[in-house]
UniProtKB/Swiss-Prot annotation:
<keyword id="KW-0131">Cell cycle</keyword>
<dbReference type="GO" id="GO:0042597">
    <property type="term" value="C:periplasmic space"/>
</dbReference>
<comment type="similarity">
    <text>Belongs to the TolB family.</text>
</comment>
<feature type="signal peptide">
    <location>
        <begin position="1"/>
        <end position="22"/>
    </location>
</feature>
<dbReference type="GO" id="GO:0051301">
    <property type="term" value="P:cell division"/>
</dbReference>
<dbReference type="InterPro" id="IPR014167">
    <property type="entry name" value="Tol-Pal_TolB"/>
</dbReference>
<dbReference type="InterPro" id="IPR007195">
    <property type="entry name" value="TolB_N"/>
</dbReference>
<dbReference type="InterPro" id="IPR011659">
    <property type="entry name" value="PD40"/>
</dbReference>
<keyword id="KW-0574">Periplasm</keyword>
<dbReference type="GO" id="GO:0017038">
    <property type="term" value="P:protein import"/>
</dbReference>
<protein>
    <recommendedName>
        <fullName>Tol-Pal system protein TolB</fullName>
    </recommendedName>
</protein>
<keyword id="KW-0732">Signal</keyword>
<comment type="function">
    <text>Part of the Tol-Pal system, which plays a role in outer membrane invagination during cell division and is important for maintaining outer membrane integrity. TolB occupies a key intermediary position in the Tol-Pal system because it communicates directly with both membrane-embedded components, Pal in the outer membrane and TolA in the inner membrane.</text>
</comment>
<dbReference type="Pfam" id="PF07676">
    <property type="entry name" value="PD40"/>
</dbReference>
<dbReference type="InterPro" id="IPR011042">
    <property type="entry name" value="6-blade_b-propeller_TolB-like"/>
</dbReference>
<keyword id="KW-0132">Cell division</keyword>
<dbReference type="Pfam" id="PF04052">
    <property type="entry name" value="TolB_N"/>
</dbReference>
Length: 460
């Protein structure tokens, strides 16, 4: 299947939504000075396209690519205002000139019209050689509505060429949006990873929580209180049909799809205490995994689909434990940072996890490297960092954090937001997995919680 066939299919999926919202914008907070410098030159175009660009009728391809590369934390894209000149073709590039700027990689591109379609072409150029060498190039003929997706696709190709790691710029995220809408205060939304193309999947006057993607990106599991108590929903995105409803007495929550897509882990308190369970999605059979009087919740799968990380307070305060679903006696603690540790999220390759660490009145996102045993704090400057979700390639992670809208905030004051519940704004934040690069996704008029990143297979 070509990327444009996939693009068309996903476009159909999202068009089932009745509600769409304004896009969010990424605001860099710090970290780009430590990244590899690269120049993305504005794409050349003919007069008709220039007119449309100036009137915001088509996407600025170069700006999207530059933002993608910068958001990864791996690259520092030189702002257009600082470009001393803008080459339009390979022969315009003077390697020694770019070398003096500390830049050895340049992206050139062009946009042209062919019939009613757009032709996007680009070159990735190595300026460390003299003469400069083209190390990657490609061309796409697309409809106008696919411009943004094509820009993300180019970013993926460039990122993989330069790092050897698959890009995630065509993936989607899901999250819960809370607004002051009297009728529908809670909304389950999806968007591009960068907050664009935001779409509402479900709206409710009662709380929605904990969305989780299926590995193929076709379904979302989430928690709803629409009936008056918590229920687990599995919803197909193509037609909005409800496939499964888990509604035992008391609490039903924290869904997590197994990487093989065959099982759903979740927590129930139907017997009084909160324990972990697994549903076989082909038979709907439910297996109890933990059985004790403590709180056991927030499961996250290891890549083998046989082991879970989860939060338990069996030691007195919440900590992260690991358990094999076929041997529930094999449970052991794996988090050791001071304070409490909870809400684990395992990387897709199983080499590390991120979690929420609470210590001395502060709340951070921390990382545990399973290969070295090293634990480190990634968001020391965030307020109430929560619910981390790792990108499919393990390079970035997303989390919710709080903007304190008062002059006593020790971090920063942001007055751009309105309709802020409880005077504070919960926003989406994006960070590199080493914690050196951070950005906020601004632009929503509500509080955003429970972000979750789709897999690499879930794109347009």
């Amino acid at each position: 299947m070509t990327i444009f066939q996939k693009s068309f299919i996903l476009l159909i999926i999202w068009n089932f939504s009745l509600f769409a919202f304004s896009d969010m914008k990424i605001e860099i907070t710090h970290g780009i000075n430590t990244a590899h410098p690269i120049a993305v030159i504005p794409f050349i175009n003919n007069e008709n396209i220039t007119h449309e660009l100036n009137n915001d009728n088509i996407e600025d391809i170069a700006s999207i690519i530059a933002a993608d590369l910068r958001n990864s934390g791996k690259f520092n894209t030189l702002p257009i205002a600082y470009l001393p000149y803008q080459p339009s073709k390979l022969t315009d590039i003077i390697p020694t000139f770019w070398e003096k700027l500390g830049i050895n990689t340049v992206v050139l591109g062009a946009i042209n019209i062919k019939n009613e379609n757009y032709v996007i072409s680009y070159q990735l150029i190595d300026t460390s050689n003299n003469p400069a060498l083209v190390i990657l190039d490609n061309q796409y003929e697309i409809e106008k509505k696919h411009l943004r997706y094509t820009a993300h696709t180019i970013s993926d190709e460039i990122f993989e060429k330069l790092t050897g790691i698959k890009g995630v710029f065509c993936t989607r995220i899901a999250y819960i949006l809370y607004t002051n809408n009297i009728k529908y205060a809670y909304e389950l939304c999806t968007s591009d990873y960068d907050g664009h193309n935001q779409v509402s999947i479900c709206r409710s006057s009662e709380p929605l929580m904990s969305p989780a993607w299926s590995p193929d990106g076709k379904k979302l599991a989430y928690v709803t209180f629409a009936s008056g108590h918590s229920e687990l929903i599995i919803q197909t995105l193509t037609n909005r049909s409800i496939d499964n409803i888990i509604q035992f007495p008391n609490h039903n929550g924290a869904p997590a799809w197994s990487p093989d897509g065959k099982k759903l882990a979740f927590s129930l308190s139907k017997t009084g205490s909160l324990n972990l369970y697994i549903m076989d999605l082909s038979s709907n059979n439910i297996q109890q995994i933990t059985s004790n009087r403590y709180n056991n919740t927030e499961p996250s799968w290891f890549p083998d689909s046989q082991n879970l990380a989860y939060t338990s307070d069996q030691g007195g305060v919440p900590q992260v434990y690991k358990i094999n679903i076929n041997n529930n006696r094999d449970s052991h603690r794996i988090s050791w940072l001071n304070g409490s540790n909870q809400k684990p999220n395992i990387s897709m390759d199983g080499t590390f996890m991120v979690m929420v660490n609470r210590n001395k009145g502060k709340q951070y996102i921390s990382k545990l490297n399973f290969l070295t045993g090293e634990e480190e704090t990634l968001t020391a400057d965030s307020v109430l960092a929560d619910t981390p979700s790792i990108s499919p390639n393990g390079i970035m992670f997303m989390y919710s954090s709080i903007i304190l809208n008062n002059s006593s905030s020790e971090l920063y004051l942001d007055k751009k937001f309105t309709n802020i519940p409880d005077n504070n704004q919960s926003i989406l934040s994006l960070a590199s997995i080493d914690g050196k690069f951070k950005a906020h996704l601004n632009g929503s008029t509500g509080s955003i919680r429970f972000p979750t990143w789709s897999s690499l297979s879930c794109s347009y």
